[in-house]
């Protein structure tokens, strides 16, 4: 029964005996609250009490909860005062009956992720997509020795073809065109709403260990050199990535875009061209990209260029051999066709991404959900614009710039209105090719098909599809991209547990509106997004007094969140998480205003809807995991998010409407009105 009531209790997390025990414990613990609720219902029995408790607002100075019927009653811990710990109040009943395995977690976002993984597993196991079916039929364990020999031949070619640095740069470009991370990927990426051929960093590069590499490179010294060199470049990429989040002055940290334009019309982003004779320049030329059309490049390419120049020919050959093994060893070692397909799909920038994106959009998400969420996004935009206009601290010039950026912001919902038909990779019909060879051929098409189909495009649909190649719409995520000033709401958000057409407006405005759409919109105005203007140029949105006040408020947010503790005593890094926390608070405010714009009726009805909205906001961030999970997930240099309970408690107590809705006049987390942080 509880598994039906609590949608996010994982099937393998709790036994029947535990369910019985926790059920008895839960109802015994909440017996007094149940009696109070029954008394309240009896007292109001002469009324239509299907909605708010119209007489339940506590008197000033009286700290007690409003006990009423709620869409979310199954999650609420009525014994916890909403002014003491709202996250516990809104999700405590669920927390009490949910048991997770050591080091694991469950919750709303975890459920979204589980559904995404379930979809991928299903399509890979069933082979219902034509391209997948062809690979299914071609797979045979008898091809193992043939496949190993093919890989060994590739390593032999690297050994024979690379005798100096210039040949190494050419071989890098050749392997990139074949879909290898050597040590960057070659594809397409949009910068300021124009798609360029691109050198793309790959966060998954460098994970193959020396034992596997040693299967294909028998010489121990050569194997060690290959692994060491590859790990160095992988670490370099990670260091560049971490540097994006490093503080640059008081609370100036934020999401930095990782691509710039080399050559072509740079629009002031970066000086055109590269030093003559530099490795990156030679790779650039070997890829066949002209200076006139330009190339989008990973912002850390200069650091790669420096390391290229310091590397010996032996090290460069080792790097190239490692690149081949790093990608292909898992394909060759797959036990069956499903495992092979999952390895391909899980790879970063995989060639089947657009096929999967389209299939997911057409089979998993009702079209009407996209229309409803699109409408919701425009309501949030309208509410945000009103808040900008009424901002008490922005100057007239600052308001005009902010509203212009918001108005020009693209909001991608789910999938494009039309797909680029010339961007479909095709699986070869050659019956002599093994499944591994078919996959390698698909990777070659990533450059030969995607680059000509997308380069130079400037329209919404092509920009969106370009982003979908590395940010697939079936993943559990949503992003804001500053150099294109666009929000991308993945299609996985258009179904439960995020957008749920069977639930109330309060739920959908909170979970889809606040934690997703409003959150991503506000990223355009956080400590990172505010460094970019309406057209994606790296030019501060605010100046003078506006910028000074904004950074002061960001500093207040950093200090406030730095007071929270998690995972057995770890303090939240308020500076590292400030951009996400600003986005959370902005989304919470904007979606609330959007909801209130839809709610008519009496003041009591509006207060009831407000309470339901804030309760749903907590459900959107609902999560349970032990200290091991919390430490592993949040105590890392690249995770810029605070733990979910902090994202709730750190923000709701900043909002005046929250206090009004629940009649809160005190409590452990109460913040005096004059001390509440008001940004967006």
Predicted segments with their positions:
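Short secondary-structure subsegments characteristic of cysteine-rich extracellular domains
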Residues: 101-127, 221, 239, 244-252, ...
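N-terminal module-boundary/linker segments of secreted carbohydrate-active enzymes
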Residues: 59-91
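Noncatalytic, helix-rich "gating/capping" subdomain that lines the substrate-entry/channel surface
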Residues: 119-380, 416
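Active-site-surrounding "flap" and adjacent substrate/cofactor-binding loops of secreted or lumenal enzymes
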Residues: 81-84, 89-145
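Zinc-dependent metallohydrolase catalytic domains
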Residues: 164-170, 375-514, 518-680
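Bacterial N-terminal signal peptides that target proteins for export
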Residues: 5, 9, 16-32
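Bacterial Sec-dependent N-terminal signal peptides
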Residues: 38-64
């Amino acid at each position: 029964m509880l598994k039906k009531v609590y949608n996010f209790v994982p099937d393998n997390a709790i036994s029947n005996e535990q369910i019985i025990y926790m059920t008895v414990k839960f109802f015994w613990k909440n017996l007094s609250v149940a009696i109070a609720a029954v008394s309240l219902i009896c007292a109001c029995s002469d009324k239509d009490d299907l909605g708010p408790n119209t007489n339940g607002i506590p008197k000033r100075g009286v700290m007690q909860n409003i006990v009423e019927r709620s869409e979310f009653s199954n999650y609420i811990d009525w014994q916890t005062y909403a002014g003491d710990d709202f996250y516990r109040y809104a999700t405590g009943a669920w927390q009490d009956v949910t048991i997770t395995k050591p080091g694991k977690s469950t919750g709303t976002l975890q459920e979204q992720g589980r559904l995404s993984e379930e979809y991928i597993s299903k399509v890979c196991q069933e082979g219902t997509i034509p391209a997948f079916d062809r690979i299914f039929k071609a797979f045979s364990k008898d091809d193992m020795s043939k496949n190993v020999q093919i890989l060994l031949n590739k390593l032999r070619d690297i050994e024979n073809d690379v005798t100096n640095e210039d040949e190494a740069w050419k071989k890098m470009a050749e392997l990139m065109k074949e879909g290898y991370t050597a040590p960057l990927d070659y594809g397409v990426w949009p910068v300021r709403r124009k798609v360029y051929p691109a050198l793309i960093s790959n966060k998954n590069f460098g994970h193959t260990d020396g034992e596997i590499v040693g299967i294909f490179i028998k010489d121990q010294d050569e194997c060690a050199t290959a692994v060491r060199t590859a790990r160095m470049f992988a670490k370099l990429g990670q260091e560049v990535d971490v540097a994006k989040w490093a503080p640059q002055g008081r609370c100036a940290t934020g999401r930095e875009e990782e691509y710039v334009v080399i050559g072509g019309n740079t629009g002031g982003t970066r000086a055109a061209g590269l030093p003559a004779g530099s490795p990156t320049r030679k790779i650039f030329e070997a890829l066949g990209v002209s200076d006139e059309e330009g190339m989008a490049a990973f912002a850390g390419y200069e650091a790669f260029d420096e390391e290229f120049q310091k590397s010996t020919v032996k090290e460069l050959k080792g790097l190239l051999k490692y690149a081949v093994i790093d990608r292909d060893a898992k394909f060759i070692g797959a036990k069956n066709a499903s495992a092979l397909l999952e390895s391909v799909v899980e790879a970063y920038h995989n060639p089947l991404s657009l096929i999967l994106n389209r299939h997911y959009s057409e089979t998993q998400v009702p079209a009407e959900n996209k229309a409803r969420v699109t409408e919701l996004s425009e309501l949030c935009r309208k509410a945000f614009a009103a808040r900008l206009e009424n901002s008490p601290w922005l100057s007239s010039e600052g308001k005009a710039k902010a509203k212009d950026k918001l108005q020009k912001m693209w909001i991608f919902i789910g999938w494009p209105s039309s797909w680029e038909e010339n961007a479909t990779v095709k699986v070869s019909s050659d019956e002599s090719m093994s499944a591994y060879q078919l996959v390698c051929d698909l990777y070659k098409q990533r450059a030969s098909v995607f680059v000509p189909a997308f380069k130079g495009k400037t329209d919404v649909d092509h920009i969106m599809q370009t982003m979908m190649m590395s940010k697939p719409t079936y993943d559990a995520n949503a992003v804001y991209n500053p150099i294109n000033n666009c929000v991308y709401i993945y299609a996985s958000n258009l179904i439960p547990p995020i957008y749920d057409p069977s639930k109330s407006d309060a739920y959908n405005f909170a979970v889809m509106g606040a934690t997703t759409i409003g959150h991503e919109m506000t990223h355009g105005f956080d400590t990172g997004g505010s460094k970019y203007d309406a057209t994606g140029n790296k030019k501060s949105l605010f100046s003078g007094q506006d910028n000074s006040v904004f950074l002061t408020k960001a500093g207040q947010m950093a200090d406030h969140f730095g007071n929270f503790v998690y995972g057995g005593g770890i303090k939240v890094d308020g500076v590292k998480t400030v951009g996400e926390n600003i986005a959370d608070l902005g989304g919470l405010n904007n979606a609330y205003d959007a909801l209130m714009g839809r709610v008519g009726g009496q003041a009591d009805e509006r207060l009831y809807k407000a309470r339901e909205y804030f309760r749903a906001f907590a459900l959107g961030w609902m999560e349970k995991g032990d200290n091991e999970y919390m430490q592993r997930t949040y105590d890392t240099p690249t995770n810029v998010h605070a733990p979910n309970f902090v994202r709730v408690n750190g923000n709701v107590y900043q909002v005046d409407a929250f206090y009004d809705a629940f009649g809160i006049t005190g409590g452990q987390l109460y913040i005096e009105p004059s001390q509440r942080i008001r940004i967006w």
